[in-house]
Design a protein with these regions (language model features):
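SDR active-site lid
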Residues: 116-175
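Residue(s) in the substrate-gating loop at a strand-loop-helix junction
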Residues: 83
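Substrate-binding pocket helix/loop in short-chain dehydrogenase/reductase
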Residues: 41-54
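Conserved NAD(P)H cofactor-binding loop of Rossmann-fold oxidoreductase domains
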Residues: 33-38
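Active-site loop immediately N-terminal to the catalytic Tyr-X3-Lys motif
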Residues: 43, 90-94
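Active-site-adjacent segment of SDR/Rossmann-fold oxidoreductases
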Residues: 71-72, 88, 109-120
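Active-site helix of classical SDR
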Residues: 65, 99
Length: 208
């Protein structure tokens, strides 16, 4: 069973859910991996682009989770691909970091709610993943920093499945990303945001 769907569209999701329901099957595993990594100053957004990114990164994933928990098989597993970018505020990447932060928080909350039913919810926080060519180019331009923070999609997929099998609630992918997360906890928020602003204010991308 294969059916294309626009995760940011409520109508498209409804059609997808109807198609699934007609088959009468229970959800054994859900992996939410779709997202929009638009990166630019917030004032440069349009209302349409803002809603699209929020829906693609959070609303769509939450809607999929709702269907999954309402039609879950025993010991069902849900994997939500979030991002290390959602751990702290990111100027010039504000909407992306906010939506990924929301997805992480939602995943952790949901994992507690459905634990008694034997359903596992795991939030995966990778760094950059070299998927589209513009992303690969950006990683190359960041040189050593980009290479250290990036993980191939195959590695993220393998670690995500392993984490779900172990019943973990949240996993940061990559030694460098784990190290940076631990180190930045020692820094004041103003300093972290100043550093992030300096790096990301020079970059603007919108492949959507």
């Amino acid at each position: 069973f294969v059916k294309a769907m626009d995760l940011s569209s409520e109508k498209s999701r409804a059609e997808f859910f109807a198609a699934l329901s007609s088959r009468g099957e229970k959800v054994k595993m859900l992996i939410n991996v779709a997202g929009a990594d638009i990166q630019k100053a917030f004032e440069e957004y349009t209302q349409e682009k803002l809603l699209f990114q929020c829906r693609a990164n959070f609303e769509g994933a939450a809607a999929m989770c709702l269907y999954a928990v309402q039609h879950a098989a025993k010991k069902a597993k849900i994997i939500n691909i979030s991002s290390v970018s959602g751990i702290y505020p990111m100027p010039y990447f504000a909407v992306y970091s906010a939506t990924k932060g929301a997805l992480t928080s939602f995943s952790l909350s949901l994992s507690r709610e459905v634990k008694k039913r034997g359903i596992t919810v795991t939030a995966i926080l990778p760094g950059a993943m070299p998927t589209r060519e513009d992303v690969r180019k950006q990683i190359r331009e960041q040189k050593a920093w980009g290479k250290l923070a990036a993980e191939p999609p195959s590695v993220v997929a393998r670690k995500s499945l392993r984490a779900a099998e172990k019943g973990k609630r949240k996993v940061i992918v990559g030694f460098w990303n784990k190290l940076m997360n631990a180190a930045t906890k020692l820094l004041p928020l103003s300093l972290k945001m100043k550093f992030i602003e300096k790096r990301w204010s020079k970059i603007s991308k919108d492949a959507f």
